[in-house]
């Protein structure tokens, strides 16, 4: 019995610590987002990094505290050394923030639009308009149609990076607000979600030591309570 136990102990395999063999890679945003490091991820094989999604808040990326509710998503599309490049694949807004914007005696108007930018990128954009007072159905329809047209027109006239900047930093929302408030009193506009459906021309590869470009915020106009 003792011999059997000895053989068993001798033939037992030692578990390998796979974490020790992993290499950490820095994930960079595209140059249009500053080419900054937004996180690190481990991998045994760099090929397994391709397709991984990294999340960062717009506040952390731009140092704009007012953008804390917006989350951006970047997909790894290349690896060089210990650096992983990525491309923007979409954004969303926290549910808590969206709920906090809805008030009684106001109407909520949603629009979901598939658009294509000047350089061939296809995106699905979701926008929200909150009216200052309750709107009738025909007003809601008119505003929704106008929202969709503005989003399509801006996408068609701009390149991908410029359109994404307008979505995230308020330019698109301000355009919708300015045009639609002529039709009905509005309180707020949010471009609360986007998703890249098809990529157009090659996305520029981030470089390790690129200087971050300052991004000026285009505030969404808002009426007073």
Curated annotation (Swiss-Prot):
Keyword terms, alphabetized: Ribonucleoprotein, Ribosomal protein
Any one of the GO BP annotations: translation
Family: Belongs to the eukaryotic ribosomal protein eS1 family.
Protein name: Small ribosomal subunit protein eS1
GO cellular component: ribonucleoprotein complex; ribosome
Superkingdom, natural source: Archaea
The keyword Ribosomal protein is annotated on this UniProt entry: yes
PANTHER family, per the entry: 40S RIBOSOMAL PROTEIN S3A
An example molecular function term from Gene Ontology annotations: structural constituent of ribosome
Record lineage: Archaea, Methanobacteriati, Methanobacteriota, Methanomada group, Methanococci
């Amino acid at each position: 019995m003792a011999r059997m136990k000895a053989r068993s102990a001798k033939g037992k395999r030692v578990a390998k610590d796979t974490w020790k063999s992993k290499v950490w890679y820095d994930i960079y945003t595209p140059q249009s987002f500053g080419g900054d490091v937004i996180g690190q991820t481990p991998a045994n094989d760099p090929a397994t990094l391709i397709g991984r999604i990294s999340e960062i808040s717009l506040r952390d990326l731009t140092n704009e505290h007012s953008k804390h509710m917006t989350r951006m998503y970047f997909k790894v599309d290349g690896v060089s050394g210990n650096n992983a490049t990525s491309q923007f694949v979409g954004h969303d807004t926290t549910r808590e923030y969206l709920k906090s914007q809805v008030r009684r005696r106001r109407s909520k108007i949603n629009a979901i639009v598939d658009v294509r930018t000047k350089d061939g990128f296809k995106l699905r954009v979701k926008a929200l308009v909150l009216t200052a007072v309750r709107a009738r159905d025909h007003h809601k329809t008119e505003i929704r149609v106008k929202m969709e047209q503005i989003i399509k027109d801006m996408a068609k006239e701009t390149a991908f990076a410029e359109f994404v900047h307008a979505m995230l930093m308020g330019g698109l929302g301000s355009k919708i607000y300015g045009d639609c408030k002529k039709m009905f009193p509005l309180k707020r506009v949010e471009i609360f979600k986007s998703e890249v459906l098809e990529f157009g021309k090659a996305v520029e590869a981030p470089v390790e030591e690129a200087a971050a470009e300052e991004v000026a915020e285009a505030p969404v106009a808002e009426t007073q309570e």
